[in-house]
From Swiss-Prot:
Catalyses which reaction(s): tRNA(Val) + L-valine + ATP = L-valyl-tRNA(Val) + AMP + diphosphate
Short sequence motif 'KMSKS' region: positions: 549-553
Task performed by this protein: Catalyzes the attachment of valine to tRNA(Val). As ValRS can inadvertently accommodate and process structurally similar amino acids such as threonine, to avoid such errors, it has a 'posttransfer' editing activity that hydrolyzes mischarged Thr-tRNA(Val) in a tRNA-dependent manner.
Notes on the domains: ValRS has two distinct active sites: one for aminoacylation and one for editing. The misactivated threonine is translocated from the active site to the editing site.
E.C. code: 6.1.1.9
One example of a Gene Ontology biological process annotation: valyl-tRNA aminoacylation
Name by which UniProt lists this protein: Valine--tRNA ligase
A GO cellular-component term linked to this record: cytosol
């Protein structure tokens, strides 16, 4: 494809100006649609790209992982694949709502639903534009014609079709049962949205008594839940309490009576060994409640306040009614104060313990009884673990994280959220006599629907109750492979795009293995009966200088725009590529500076090499000089190494090998060894061989660097060679000469050069200072004559002497020319 960057048509500027180059390249790429998917399904390489959440500005941590995917996309494109590389924006759900609330300095509950969702759409549009501009500056090679966003009508149609398909297959259900509740955002959440935080608290030892009057002590961190106590438990192996089996205890706050029961989940060595079960303090309470068929006493509201307290009995040591309406945090202290006043607070020990909190708001989780929609998980854990084994994980160690997550799951996936801006459930509930509560669904051809606005076929407004909840944002983004194919199981079909499933690659960071990766595997298994992608590539975190995860909420995130202004996109991409796949990396300006030095060196080396040939017209002649065959042998191995590693998504290893070849083999040594022949100071044959090799090696080097440094390589290639570099074929190692013997001789030659350089450095003389004699002994004494001639010119040596091999090691002696006295 004959695409050139106009600014550099004639020659390379004296300095690399990254801002000018980036603008020119983007304009040319857009004009010629370099990254457009051509529609060749059979030759496609399909990437399931993570849609960034519209929850605030992107930072260097996002840049880090999105660059990793682009390295692979660019390689696959050059390797002959028709790359299907979309970008989406996840702009529905709680993260976007929280952003709007922060920007507008209000809460969603203060506005009418329609007004707030309109505000959300406006803000998400603004941030999608910002995201788009940043990705373009980074040189991410998306096909922008494939762009989607999750609150669009098209994606809502697919998401609601997913719901209908799962409902038809009995893979989801609606039920009242215990759920995790965020009291700040006032919504149900899933286990994947929970983080564990170490918080300061107190372990309170509190006196209960049996109906018979025996004093018994329990230990708890949540005394405010005592009015919700429904049983006391002890371990059946604990001899201290076995006599209590079947007795009743009187709860001090409120005075109601509860059974004392054995259960082996109680730890004998924790607290007093006697535990109260409340509905609900934690997931163990839920287990006991279900297993022992206990009563339900729900006293925590959706906003985290104490409510619905039962009437106090005459046995109450402390009236519960006084705590009604208090927030749980305030009630915790108030209950302890009351217990202490009544002589029932035995002890209070300060502790730091792990508390499950909502990932977004940071609020400690409450467990409430509520009607919600759930996707079945528990009964299919074995099949899901089998699906995990079918995917190729890069690195493979990340597979274990998914396995552990699935093995430890105890609940089905709650997908309903009590929020406003999201994909609505396509559900109404009948109010007709004889079918009250019946679930009513639309025809798939009518999607998307909004139950608050639309009606099911054959029903009037007064005959239905719309489902007012919205879906978990993961319930939508988990069908990202289906976004690409416009198909969901058998419900929605697109025969032209269906062959793109399963996709070739999912790229994402490791913290969302438990959410995005897991939910996508779950949905694809239910919809399609197979894995969603052949490969999954997992990036690590970008860490701040204090080695904590870089994040907007922590205030330690670096601004990518200013970094791009200062260092340029290629330097930023270089920094991103220097971290091994799956490994965390600390943000480093030193690495950015190294990347900037690399782009400058590549620019300058290209200018130097270009002085020896006309663009795309190297001199005729066969590369035959031994030194030239040495560098081509090194190049052959670099190309083979990089091809193999990029096939395995090991971008870091590929860049490192290219960089090492460029700096050490090409710039530091080969250019110096070949300079005299390139300047035509030797034979015509030697000159032709040198210039042809320089031409071929530089061209191949640019191709090897292109996935990582797309701008500088485009500018150089578009000036010195023909066409757009990103539309060229990836180099083939088999087409580059390899000679093992000459590679060995060349490597030995470089060791000799290093000894000469050391001698000159030690003598504190110039690299151009003349050498009287280089004596070479050991095994490597059968150098081709022309190699020694190249060595002589490079080292400014008058004579090179080869001695008989009397050692298994290379031996080098350097005699510098005598210093000329100024007298």
């Amino acid at each position: 494809m004959n695409v050139r960057v106009r600014h550099f048509m004639q020659s390379l500027d004296s300095r690399y100006q990254h801002k000018t180059v980036e603008e020119e390249c983007n304009a040319a790429w857009d004009e010629h649609k370099i990254y457009k998917w051509k529609g060749n399904v059979a030759q496609s390489f399909v990437i399931d790209t993570p849609p960034p959440t519209v929850s605030g500005v992107l930072h260097m941590g996002h840049v880090f992982s999105y660059c990793h995917t682009d390295f692979i996309a660019r390689y696959q494109r050059m390797a002959g694949k028709d790359v299907f590389y979309p970008i989406g924006f996840d702009d529905n759900g709680l993260p976007t709502e929280r952003l709007v609330e922060k920007i507008k300095k209000l809460r969603a509950v203060q506005l009418e639903r329609a007004e707030f969702t309109k505000m959300c759409r406006e803000v998400s549009h603004e941030f999608r534009t910002k995201f788009r501009n940043l990705f373009r500056r980074l040189g991410i090679s998306y096909d922008w014609a494939l762009e989607y966003h999750t609150v669009s009508e098209e994606v809502q149609r697919l998401s609601q079709a997913s719901f209908l398909d799962l409902y038809a297959k009995d893979k989801l259900y609606r039920k009242q049962q215990p759920i995790l509740w965020d009291t700040v955002d006032c919504t149900a959440i899933a286990h994947a949205e929970v983080e564990e935080l170490d918080l300061h608290s107190h372990l309170n030892t509190i006196s209960f008594h049996t109906v018979g009057g025996e004093k018994i002590d329990i230990a708890t961190t949540r005394p405010e839940l005592i009015p919700a106590c429904v049983a006391l438990f002890f371990n059946p192996e604990d001899d201290r309490y076995t006599h209590l089996h079947g007795q009743f205890a009187v709860v001090p706050v409120g005075g109601h009576k509860v059974k004392i029961l054995p259960d082996d989940k109680v730890r004998i060595d924790k607290g007093t060994g006697l535990v109260m079960c409340c509905t609900f303090g934690d997931e163990t309470d839920v287990y006991w409640w279900r297993t022992h068929n206990l009563d339900t006493k729900t006293i925590v509201s959706r906003t985290g306040h104490i409510v619905d307290l039962a009437e106090d009995t005459p046995d109450a040591k402390i009236p519960a009614a006084q705590f009604d309406g208090m927030h749980v945090q305030k009630a915790r202290k108030a209950v302890c104060d009351a217990l202490e006043g009544a002589g029932l607070l035995v002890s209070q020990e300060p502790i730091v313990h792990t508390v499950k909190c909502a990932e977004r708001s940071g609020a400690p989780i409450e467990i409430l009884l509520s009607h919600q929609w759930f996707v079945r998980v528990m009964e299919h854990k074995h099949e899901l673990l089998e699906q995990v084994q079918k995917v190729q994980w890069h690195p493979d160690s990340m597979r274990k994280r998914m396995e552990i997550w699935i093995e430890n799951l105890n609940w089905d996936w709650c997908i309903s959220r009590q929020r406003y801006f999201g994909v609505p459930f396509p559900v109404w509930y009948s109010k007709r006599e004889g079918e009250v509560g019946k679930v009513l669904l639309p025809d798939v051809r009518d999607l998307p629907v909004d139950p608050l606005r639309d009606l099911p076929s054959g029903y009037g407004r007064d005959e239905v109750e719309p489902d007012v909840d919205v879906m978990d944002t993961w319930a939508t983004s988990s069908i990202s492979p289906q976004f690409l194919t416009k198909s969901v199981g058998q419900v929605l079909r697109n025969e032209n795009l269906e062959p793109l499933f399963p996709t070739d690659l999912r790229a994402q960071s490791h913290e969302i293995i438990r959410s995005w990766a897991f939910y996508t595997m779950l949905k694809s298994y239910y919809h399609n009966g197979e894995i969603p992608w052949q490969n999954i590539m997992i990036s690590g975190w970008c860490l701040a200088e204090d080695k904590t995860k870089m994040s907007k909420s922590k205030g330690n995130a670096m601004d990518p725009e200013s970094t791009l202004d200062l260092y340029g996109a290629d330097s930023v991409r270089y920094w991103a590529a220097k971290s091994r796949l799956g490994a965390d990396t600390v943000f480093s300006e030193e690495v950015l500076k190294t990347g900037r030095r690399l782009t400058t060196k590549l620019w300058n080396a290209s200018k130097f090499v270009a002085t020896f040939f006309l663009r795309d017209n190297p001199p005729a002649g066969t590369t035959a000089a031994p030194t030239d065959l040495w560098i081509l042998s090194k190049l052959h191995k670099a190309v083979a190494h990089n091809t193999e590693n990029l096939k395995l998504f090991e971008y870091c290893a590929a860049l490192n090998r290219t960089e090492e070849f460029f700096w050490k083999d090409f710039c530091d040594n080969y250019l110096e060894l070949v300079k005299h022949r390139a300047y035509n100071h030797g034979s015509a044959h030697g000159h032709a061989s040198a210039v042809s090799t320089l031409h071929h090696t530089l061209k191949t080097l640019l191709l090897l660097f292109a996935p990582f440094l797309p701008y500088v390589t485009e500018a150089v290639y578009g000036t010195l060679f023909s066409g757009c570099i990103h539309a060229q074929e990836w180099p083939n190692a088999d087409e580059i000469p390899y000679n093992a013997s000459l590679e060995q001789h060349g490597d030995a030659l470089i060791k000799i050069v290093e000894e000469v350089r050391k001698a000159k450095t030690h003598a504190q003389v110039s690299v151009k200072y003349p050498v009287e004699l280089i004596t070479i002994g050991g095994l490597a004494t059968d150098f081709p004559e022309s190699m020694l001639e190249d060595l002589k010119h490079m080292c400014c040596a008058e004579q090179i002497k080869l001695t008989a091999p009397d050692s298994t090691e290379l031996e080098v002696a350097v005699t510098l020319a005598p210093t000329v006295s100024s007298n």
